[in-house]
Each structure stands twice: as C-alpha cells, then as structure tokens.
Amino acid sequence: MSDSDLGEDEGLLSLAGKRKRRGNLPKESVKILRDWLYLHRYNAYPSEQEKLSLSGQTNLSVLQICNWFINARRRLLPDMLRKDGKDPNQFTISRRGGKASDVALPRGSSPSVLAVSVPAPTNVLSLSVCSMPLHSGQGEKPAAPFPRGELESPKPLVTPGSTLTLLTRAEAGSPTGGLFNTPPPTPPEQDKEDFSSFQLLVEVALQRAAEMELQKQQDPSLPLLHTPIPLVSENPQ
C-alpha cells in the first residue's frame, strides 16, 4: 500500500470522526431539551422566544435547537405520548388525518398568514371585473347632453314672450330626461326629425320677429306688420 493510499484512509477516518463528534450534543444540553419536550409534549413546538431562551440555557445555537426538536418530534415524542395513552398521530407532525385545530396550533401564525393571503387575488379580480362596467357607464353619459344642447342653442335669440313659451314646452317634451335612466344613449330617429322640423319653425319665427322689429323701428307708421307674430307662435300648439 502506497503512502497516498494511507493518507486517503486517514482523511476519511478523520472526517468520520468529525461527523460523529458534530452530531453529539452535550449531555446537559440534551437533558434541558428533553425536559422541555416532556413538559410541552402535547404542543412540542417552541416559539422564537422559547428557542432563544433554550439557546441561552444550553449554550447551543438556535439552528441546533431547531434541528434537535425536528428529530425529537419523530423519535422521542411518540414514546412519551404512548406512555400517557395518547395517539402520537394526533400530536406529531407526521400525522395526515388529524384535526385541523391540531395542525393550526403548533404552527403559530403561519396558518393565519395563509388565510389572509389567499383571498387577496379574488379581491383584485372582483375589483377589476366591477370596474369595467363603471368605466363603460361613465363613457356613455357624456353622449346624452348633445341633443339637449341642440335644442337650447336658439334660446339666447328669444326676445318676444310668445316664442319663450314655445321653447319651454319643447324642453318639457324633450326625451333627454329618460336617456339618463336607460343604458342605450341613442334616442329614436323620429324624435330627432320632429324636433329638427320644430326647431326650424322656431328659428324662422325668431328671424321674422327680428325683421319686424327692425322695420317697426325704421318706419313706425306700419303697425300691421307686427300682427302675424301671435299666429306663428300658436302654430306648434
């Protein structure tokens, strides 16, 4: 056997010895951990503060304590529970058909975090779905005032009292009030044609009245030209 083979064998033996020494914890530390495990055998899941306290008592790191409890719950805890006449499957982490309350208690706050985080995507989806008709509804509303603006365009030109009554009647019978309650913003085409013809009559009457006022101011001796105004205003009735 060569010197290189002897060196390799010695290296393997030294590694094996280190692994064995690394896995063995001090007896006093193990006794403290065993006592804590027995006192909390029905809920053998130490909290973060308890881990720090055990770390100070045993002079071990928190990681070593976590690893020790993981192994102890699988190897030591079932025997402790059987001595008490309990079913280990109801208290250990290896159970599969246990109660939901037993699963939630050892994990601390992790189940509550899951319960809060799961509904979050559904809320986002519900908000995105509900926001679509809201935006579409807001986009449809500005289309309604256009027919109303067309009807009110000759309003500043009104000077006689008879034409003012005609415009107020036209506004009272306009279909724009019902458009805000119905989803489709398109009014009937027949109403548009009726109001367009009525609008032409109003404009002609206003233009005729203005011409008569000018003629009356230029030549006051023509009172007969002012008589046709009431006839024009009564035609739409």
Curated annotation (Swiss-Prot):
InterPro entries recorded for this chain?
A: HD, Homeodomain-like_sf, KN_HD, TALE_homeobox
- Phosphothreonine is carried by which residues? 182, 186
**Entry keyword annotation includes ATP-binding:** no
Q: Does the keyword Lipid biosynthesis apply?
A: no
Q: How is it modified after translation?
A: The C-terminal part is phosphorylated in response to EGF signaling by the Ras/MAPK pathway.
CDD domains of this UniProt entry? homeodomain
The free-text function statement in the UniProt record for this protein reads: Transcriptional repressor, which probably repress transcription by binding directly the 5'-CTGTCAA-3' DNA sequence or by interacting with TGF-beta activated SMAD proteins. Probably represses transcription via the recruitment of histone deacetylase proteins.
Protein family according to the UniProt entry: Belongs to the TALE/TGIF homeobox family.
Miscellaneous note, as given in the UniProt record, is: TGIF2 is amplified and overexpressed in several ovarian cancer cell lines.
Q: What is this protein identified as?
A: Homeobox protein TGIF2
Q: Which gene holds the coding sequence for this protein?
A: TGIF2
